[in-house]
Amino acid sequence: MHPGPLLFCGDPHGQWQHIIDAALNSNARAVILLGDLEPTRPLHMELEAIWERVWFIHGNHDTDHADNFANVWHSELADRNIHGRVVTLACGTRIAGLGGIFRGAVWYPNDQQAPKFRNRDEHASQTPRQERWQNSVPLKHWSSIYPDDIDQLSRLQADILITHEAPGYHEHGFKELDELARRMGVRTTVHGHQHDSIDSSARWVEQGFQSFGVGLRGLMLLDGLE
C-alpha cells in the first residue's frame, strides 16, 4: 500500500500527465477521478503508470460520443468505476460514488417536478429501439442520475462521497446530495463538474459534512480517514 494521501482529481477532459506526476510525487495511496474523463485511449492505457491506484466516477461528457463511452466503460479499469456503490480502500477509508448529472429529461430536482423515470430500466422500456444504446437508454443518458441511484446509495454507509454534481452549498448544486450525504453518514463530499473550488467551510456545521469542489484539471490531497 502506498502511504501517501488520497489524490482527488477535477475533470481531466483528456489530460493526464499532471495527475500521473502528482500521484507519483505525493506517493498517493489512491487516485480518485471526479468525472468528465474523456480519454482518447482506453483509460487503463492513459493511466498505465498508476492504474492500480485509480478509482473514478463518470461525468456527463463521458457519454458525449461512442469513443468516450468505450474508453471508459470498456477499459480494463471499468471495474474501478464506483458509481452507485461503496469501496473500501486498503487504508480502511470507505468511498461512495455518484457519477453523472441531473437532466430534465429524467429528473432535475431543482425544478421541483416529479421524476420522469425512476431508473434506467424504466427509461429504456419507453425508448424506441432505434434510439437505445447497448439495448438500454440513449447513449447520453448513461450519465444521467436516476432517483433509484440515490435511493440505493442512501442505504449504504461511507466516509467520503464523491459526486460529479455539486451538493447544495454551490450556486448550481443540489440539496438532494446534502440529504444523501447525511443519510450515508459521510464526513466529506468531493465533487467536480463546476470547474471551480469554492470555500464552503462556513456551511460545514449546518450541512453536517465537509464539502470540497475540485476545479478543472485541479488536484486536491486529503488524508485518509482511518
What are these regions (language model features)?
Residues 3-13, 92-101, 160-164, 211-214:
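Active-site-proximal beta-strand elements of phosphoester/diester hydrolases
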Residues 2-3, 18, 86-91, 179, ...:
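Binuclear metal-dependent phosphoesterase catalytic core
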Residues 19-26, 88-89, 149-155, 223-226:
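Short amphipathic alpha-helix with an adjacent loop that forms part of the alpha/beta core around
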Residues 11-13, 36-37, 60-61, 164-165, ...:
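Histidine-centered divalent metal-coordination motifs
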Residues 8-9, 13-90, 175, 182-183, ...:
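Core catalytic region of metal-dependent phosphoesterases/phosphodiesterases
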Residues 93-165:
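Active-site-proximal loop/helix segment associated with metal-binding centers of metalloenzymes
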Residues 12, 136-140, 170, 194, ...:
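Catalytic cores of nucleotide-sugar-dependent glycosyltransferases that transfer UDP/GDP/TDP-activated
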Residues 28, 158, 163, 177-194:
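Proline-aspartate-enriched helix->loop->beta-strand connector
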